[in-house]
């Protein structure tokens, strides 16, 4: 089935809002013929779902779409940002407290990195917040070994190409020296794999600690390691209301598992 019925909501968006996966991953599920509408297997994401129609993914009914929720999580070093790891290493889900809804990470922090990781139950929101076009700055505190060349450090503001990969502008500032290590503040608007480590290595600095302090308007602040704190509904609406239409949600913020 691939016809697009008038009205209703795009099926990939509906699956993402139900917290099953991101919108892009939902489109992949559909083209892989793993999604059905009223019992008919779909092969195109260009389908709208009307109220009362039944959607299944891998034969299981689609969960009711929950109100959009966003959480701040203090990721510890040594946890993989993934649902499972083929090498058997601990993942962020092994460190999360019980009682949370099904959550997806916004972007990622590699296993050796720590600090602020946003989690959401809304796949569409996850995708929007990951896009560089959103314009949100990711800010990091970085400890790195090596001699700081201030001219090369400032040159990162023009972007850099490392091993054939082009990175956008990076703001890097030396805060202080601690023995043979430098503490820096680094800010960027995109999140390519291991970007901070690679651009600093490009200017002769080897990162040995990386802490994300902020993702857009959301700050790590004093949130303890492994703790999760929900972003209050009003703050969520104020900060991302222009990105997605969010229904009002009378709920109190929660903090869990400072562990």
What name fits each language-model region?
Residues 1-259:
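Basic, flexible Lys/Arg- and Gly-enriched helix-loop patches that mediate nucleic-acid binding at interfaces
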């Amino acid at each position: 089935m691939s016809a697009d019925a008038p009205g209703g909501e795009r099926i990939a968006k509906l699956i993402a809002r139900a917290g099953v996966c991101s919108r892009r991953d939902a489109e992949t599920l559909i083209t892989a013929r793993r999604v059905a509408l009223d019992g008919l297997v779909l092969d195109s994401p260009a389908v709208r779902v009307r109220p009362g129609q039944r959607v299944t993914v891998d034969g299981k009914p689609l969960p009711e779409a929950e109100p959009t929720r966003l959480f701040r999580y203090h990721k510890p070093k040594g946890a993989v940002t993934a649902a499972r790891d083929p090498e058997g290493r601990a993942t962020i889900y092994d460190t999360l407290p019980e009682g949370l809804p099904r959550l997806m990470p916004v972007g990622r922090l590699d296993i050796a990195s720590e600090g602020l990781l946003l989690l959401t139950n809304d796949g569409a929101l996850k995708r929007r917040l990951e896009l560089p076009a959103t314009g949100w700055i990711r800010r990091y505190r970085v400890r790195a070994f090596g001699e700081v060349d201030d001219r090369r450090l400032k040159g990162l503001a023009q972007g850099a190409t490392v091993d054939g990969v082009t990175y956008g502008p990076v703001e890097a500032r030396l805060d202080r020296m601690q023995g043979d290590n430098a503490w820096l503040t680094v800010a960027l608007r995109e999140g390519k794999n291991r970007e901070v480590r690679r651009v600093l290595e490009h200017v002769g600095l080897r990162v040995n600690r990386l802490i994300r302090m902020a993702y857009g308007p959301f700050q790590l602040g004093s949130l303890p390691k492994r703790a999760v704190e929900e972003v209050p509904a009003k703050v969520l609406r104020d900060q991302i209301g222009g990105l997605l239409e969010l229904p009002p949600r009378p709920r109190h913020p929660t903090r869990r598992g400072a562990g």
